[in-house]
Amino acid sequence: SKHVAQWLKTAGTQSVVFISSTSVYQQTNGEWVSENDADTPQNITTNILLEAEQNILEAGPAVAILRSSGIYGPGRGHLFRQFMNGTAAIEGDGKRFLNMVHLDDLVEAIILALELVGRHGIYNITDDEPGTQLNFFKWLSETTGRPMPPFVPEPNPSTAKRRITNKRVSNKLIKKTFGLLHNYPTFREGFTQELDRLANGKTRQPLSP
């Protein structure tokens, strides 16, 4: 990221958008988090992301860092794929929050950030309503008539591939700064479209983000 930042400083670009991740937030108690709450990195990946953000942010006066939550839409969405394949499971009591954003809304945010030059800073891009695992699968079950996934124990933090977090990511800043209006304000609108797409014979299964 240092080499990229150095190149940006000499390239004279008018605006820069860097896509980061809401995984920089390591909170575990279901609390709301904003752009100022990523100050306690817990692992190598988070450290690398935060360092990259800072390097790019210092590359010029018109840099927007977009911290994206889990992206879904045509071709994306591993939990949806698991549900449709009958391999999904609800971890623990199902009350851990999921933060998601539709691909189209992410693209819209990128375009706005490029066009509205001068909105320098870090912004979360996520939908309006974090939902729990339980509510997500309950909605899918009720909408499709398929059975609910089984409950399984929470992953052991000491053996999990990545840190298990539980937080609700706020999108207030990006909406206020860019006037962003989500086409898919919650997962319901987005996955209703995905279910319609599959029902109309467009059977390309979603892939993992």
Where are these regions (language model features)?
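NAD(P)-cofactor binding segment of oxidoreductase domains
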Residues: 1-18, 51
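Glycine/proline-rich active-site loop of Rossmann-fold NAD(P)-dependent oxidoreductases
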Residues: 47-50, 59, 71-82, 112-123, ...
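Conserved C-terminal active-site "lid" loop/helix of NAD(P)H-dependent oxidoreductases
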Residues: 138, 158-181
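Amphipathic terminal alpha-helices
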Residues: 186-209
